[in-house]
Curated annotation (Swiss-Prot):
Organism of origin: Clitoria ternatea
GO biological process: defense response
InterPro entries according to UniProt: Cyclotide, Cyclotide_bracelet_CS, Cyclotide_sf
Protein name: Cyclotide cter-D
Cysteine pairings via disulfide bonds: 4-21, 8-23, 13-28
The record's note on its domains: The presence of a 'disulfide through disulfide knot' structurally defines this protein as a knottin.
Cross-link (Cyclopeptide (Gly-Asn)): 1-31
Lineage start: Eukaryota, Viridiplantae, Streptophyta, Embryophyta, Tracheophyta
This protein's UniProt keywords: Disulfide bond, Knottin, Plant defense
Length: 31
């Protein structure tokens, strides 16, 4: 539920994905 300051509209979460973030509603979120 916490925004990870990375979008995933065109490409998946990259750097923030390593921190455990995942794509939701075009934005990378962590819980």
């Amino acid at each position: 539920g916490i925004p990870c300051a990375e979008s995933c509209v065109w490409i998946p979460c990259t750097v923030t994905a390593l921190l455990g973030c995942s794509c939701k509603d075009k934005v990378c979120y962590l819980n």
